Amino acid sequence: MKKLTEFLSLKKKSISIQVGIAISFTVVALFAMGAFGITMYHLFTNRMEAMMSENAVQLLDQTATNLESYLKNMRRISDTMYYSVIKDKDLASEDMVQEMNLLYDANKENLVSIACYTSNGNLVEAVPVAGEKEDVDVTEQEWFREAVGKMENFHFSTPHVQNLFDDANYRYHWVISLSRAVELTKSGDSELGVLLVDMNYSSIEQLLEKANTGINEEYVYLMDGDGEIIYHPKQKLIYAGLYEENNEEIAAWDDGSHKEDFWSENRLVTVKTVSYTGWKIVSVIWVCMRQGCFS
C-alpha cells in the first residue's frame, strides 16, 4: 500500500512537471507568435508607407514637371514681350499694340491679358481690353509692389479676380499674375515700368486636377512659399470652413516625405518645391488600417 502511494505521488509530480513544461512551451510559442506578428505588421506597414511615399514622389515629380513647363512658357511670353517689343520701342513716338496682340493671340488659351505700366501706375498699353476700370490704383496691388520692390525677379501672385479692365460680357476672370520690372524708353530716356502677364487660373487648375485620382484618402494641392493655397481639390470646403488643411505648417517643411498626426489620424505628406516660384506641390495620403481607409 505504501509503495502504491509513493508511485502515485511520483506519477503526480511527473504529470505536474509535464504540464508545467507544456504551459511554458505554450507561453513561449504564443510570445514568439505575437512577436512575429508584430514584426510582420511593422514590416507590412513600413513597406506600405514606403510604396505610398515612392508613388507620391513620382506623382509630384511628374506634376511639377508639367507645372514648371507651363510656367516656363509664361516666363517666355514675358521675356518675348520685354526683349523683343518693349526694348525696341520709344514710347514717345511708337506703340506696342500690334506686337502685343500677336503675342496674346498665339497664347490666348492660357492668358487673360498682357499689360504694361509706368512706375507711377499709368497704363502704357494692354491687350485685349475694352477699357481700364476707373478708380483702380495698380501701385497698391501686390503684383505691382513686388515687381518694383524686387526688380531683378519674376513674381507670381496667388489666384485672384482680375479687377483692372472692363469686360464686355461682364465676366470675372480668376488669374495668377506674373509681373516684373522693365525699362521703358521715352524720347530716348529710360524709366522704370512694370510688365504684367495675367495667366488664366483654370490652366493651372486643370494641371492639378489631373494629379488627383478622386480617391478621398489621397489628394494633391498647390500652395505658395508662405502656405497660401493656390489650388486644392477641397478648396470650396476650406473657404466655407468645412475642411481644414495644415498648409501653413507644411510650408516650412523640406522637400520629401513626412509623417504627421492631423485630426488624430496619421498622414503621409510629401512636399515638392516648384522651380523659380517657391511654390510647393503637396501630396497627402491618410494612413490608417481601419476599414474604409484602403479599398
Question: Where in this protein do the model-derived segments appear?
Answer:
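Solvent-exposed, extracytoplasmic
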Residues: 97-105, 130, 194-237
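Helix-start (N-cap) segments at beta->loop->alpha junctions
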Residues: 161-164, 181-186, 197-208, 236-237, ...
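Extracellular/periplasmic juxtamembrane segments that couple receptor/chemosensory ectodomains to their
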Residues: 226, 234-295
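Juxtamembrane membrane-water interface segments immediately C-terminal to a transmembrane helix
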Residues: 42-75, 94
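Extreme N-terminal signal-anchor transmembrane helix of membrane signaling/transducer proteins, especially
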Residues: 1-46, 50
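Extracytoplasmic/periplasmic ligand-binding sensor regions of membrane-associated signaling proteins
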Residues: 105, 110, 123-199
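Amphipathic coiled-coil signal-relay and dimerization helices
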Residues: 118-129, 227-233, 270-272
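Extracellular/periplasmic ligand-binding regions of membrane signal-transduction receptors
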Residues: 66-98, 114-131
